[in-house]
Amino acid sequence: MDILIISLKSLGYSRTSRPLDSGPLVVHAVAGAGKSTALRKLLARHSTFTIHTLGVPDKISIRTRGIQKPGPIPKGNFAILDEYTLDATTREAYQALFADPYQAPELSLEPHFYLETSFRTPKKAAALIASCGFDFETNSQEEGHLEVTGIFKGPLLGKVIAIDSEAETTLSRHGVEFVKPCQVTGLEFPVVTIVSAAPIEEIGQSTLFYNAITRSKGLTYVRAGT
């Protein structure tokens, strides 16, 4: 655990008052904070770590083990579970738990370490996220493009993400391909369009909206309300 704690401190994670001997080490970071990259570096440098994820696992590689789906843990290895908030039933076998608590706040634990800074989210999108009430900031140098209009007031570009059933019905009726926020956890896209039947004032503080808007690393379009 010492290696992991040293790594977290070097990456700018802040320590909470929760004692380290209180269950598994819990680490929270906002979307785009470099959590997965940091975990991959641990794997590359230290053979005693095993890292699983409930999100999207790494592609199979002949060079590295990568972050894998939950499975056997080699005896003596320090086991880490990423995206732990996606399922509360698979935590017991792990000594450390990582997640973005905003993606599933109802399943989040009190953290030992946290990081509120994203390195991926463009400045304009980050400002909108923060204005909606999330503790969120960015170190990205990209201003990005942000456009917020009614649901029928602009084109649907890039990866289209529907965040409510009415939007899904509307998109299906018009033959538009779309995904739900839960289908793109851990992924990122250069262009994202978020579609909702409700206005931004109603959806801004929702987990679904947060999950959707943090998938963008460039151009962000919000088509919400009438």
UniProtKB/Swiss-Prot annotation:
Coiled coil ranges (UniProt) are none
Q: Which residues form the (+)RNA virus helicase C-terminal domain?
A: 139-226
Give a single Pfam family match. Viral_helicase1
Q: Name one GO biological process term.
A: transport of virus in host, cell to cell
Where does the protein end up?
Host cytoplasm
One annotated Gene Ontology cellular component of this protein: host cell cytoplasm
Residue intervals of the (+)RNA virus helicase ATP-binding domain: 1-138
Keyword annotations for this protein?
Host cytoplasm, Host-virus interaction, Inhibition of host innate immune response by virus, RNA-binding, Suppressor of RNA silencing, Transport, Viral immunoevasion, Viral movement protein
Sample GO molecular function, one term: RNA binding
The UniProt similarity line reads: Belongs to the Tymovirales TGBp1 protein family.
Its assembly, as annotated, is: Homodimer and homooligomer. Interacts with capsid protein. Interacts with host AGO1; this interaction targets the host protein for degradation, thereby suppressing the antiviral RNA silencing.
> What is the protein's known function?
Transports viral genome to neighboring plant cells directly through plasmosdesmata, without any budding. The movement protein allows efficient cell to cell propagation, by bypassing the host cell wall barrier. Increases plasmodesma size exclusion limit. Acts as a suppressor of RNA-mediated gene silencing, also known as post-transcriptional gene silencing (PTGS), a mechanism of plant viral defense that limits the accumulation of viral RNAs.
Q: Any remaining note in the record?
A: TGBp1, TGBp2 and TGBp3 seem to act together for cell-to-cell propagation. TGBp1 is the main movement protein that physically cross the plasmodesma with the viral genome. TGBp2 and TGBp3 would facilitate TGBp1 function.
User: What's the protein called, per UniProt?
Assistant: Movement and silencing protein TGBp1
Q: From which source organism is this entry?
A: Potato virus X (strain HB) (PVX)
Q: What is the lineage of its organism?
A: Viruses, Riboviria, Orthornavirae, Kitrinoviricota, Alsuviricetes
